[in-house]
C-alpha cells in the first residue's frame, strides 16, 4: 500500500510543561495494553488544503440523503471521488520528474481505489473512513435533541470519515477541524460532503494522520467540543486517543464520544476505554445516552470532561 508520506512534525514544538509532568507520572503506570504505537507504522500528520477545482468536480456528483432526528437531513456522496489530489498539482514539476510522479500516482490510485470497496480495517494503512458508521448519526441525534449550543464553538471531529457530525456543527455556527487518518478520505469524501451541504469553507480546517502526530501538530490548540464516533475498536490505540482528547479539550469543554458498549471479537468498546480513564484519572466520563435499536450491539454516547482539581 502506498499511503505513507514523508512529512515531519517537530516534536520540540509540543513543549507544554504541564503535559510533560503528567506524561512522566503516566509513564510509571502499566498501560501497555492501551498503547501499541511502537508496534506499527504511523502516518505523519499534516494540514490538508481544500482540493483543487472541488466546486466544478461536484457539478455532476451523485448524492444521497442521510436522515437523523425529527426528519432533519444531511447530504453525502454516494461514492467517494476517485483519483489522487496529486494529479491536480503537477504544474511546477519538470518533465522528467513528471514521468516519475505519474507512475507513483498511478500506483497510489490503484491502491486507493482498492480501498473504496474495502469493508475491513487495515491498521496503519486504512482506518475505515470511507464507510458511514452508525455511531456518527447517534452523535448528531444527541446534539440536535439536547439542543447543544454550537454557535461560535471550536469543534474537533476525530476520525471524521464522511464528516457529518462536524458538518452539522459547521451549519450551526461552529468553527470545525476535521481529522481523518487518511488524507485520501479528506480529499475525496470529507471536503466534498462539506461543500454539498453548503458548509462555510472558511470555517473549516482539515488534518490527516495518526493521532500521535495530530496531537503534536495541534500544539496547544484547544477546542470547546470534541466529537468522535466508532473509534474504540482498537484497544492499542486508546492511549493516543486519550492524549488527543485530554491535551486539546478546553478546561470547561466537552467531548462527545459515540461507540458500541463492546466490540465483540476485538476487545474494544466504552467499558474498556473507561478502564484507561480510571487509571490515568484526568478525565471524567458519563453515559448520556443508550441506544438499543436492535440494529447492532448496544451503543452509547458518553460525555467526557476534565476533572476539577
UniProtKB/Swiss-Prot annotation:
Compartments, as annotated in UniProt: Cytoplasm, Cytosol; Nucleus; Nucleus, Nucleolus
Biased composition regions of type Basic and acidic residues, renumbered to the chain: 25-37
Binding residues annotated for S-adenosyl-L-methionine, in chain numbering: 132-136, 159, 179-181, 209-211, 229
Chief place of localization: cytoplasm
Statement: the UniProt record of this protein carries the keyword Cytoplasm: yes
GO biological process terms on file: peptidyl-lysine monomethylation; regulation of translation
Enzyme class: transferase
Keywords of the record: Cytoplasm, Methyltransferase, Nucleus, S-adenosyl-L-methionine, Transferase
Keyword match Cytoplasm: yes
Any one cellular-component term (Gene Ontology): cytosol
Disordered: annotated span: 1-37, 79-111
EC number: 2.1.1.85
Transmembrane segments: none
GO molecular function: protein-L-histidine N-tele-methyltransferase activity
One Pfam assignment: Methyltransf_16
Catalysis performed (reactions): L-histidyl-[protein] + S-adenosyl-L-methionine = N(tele)-methyl-L-histidyl-[protein] + S-adenosyl-L-homocysteine + H(+)
Compositional bias ranges of the Low complexity kind: 84-109
Family as reported in the entry's similarity comment: Belongs to the methyltransferase superfamily. METTL18 family.
Record PANTHER family: HEPATOCELLULAR CARCINOMA-ASSOCIATED ANTIGEN, HISTIDINE PROTEIN METHYLTRANSFERASE 1 HOMOLOG
Chain's role: Protein-L-histidine N-tele-methyltransferase that probably monomethylates RPL3. Through the methylation of RPL3 may regulate the dynamics of pre-rRNA processing, ribosome biogenesis, and translation.
Protein name listed in UniProt: Histidine protein methyltransferase 1 homolog
Native species: Dictyostelium discoideum
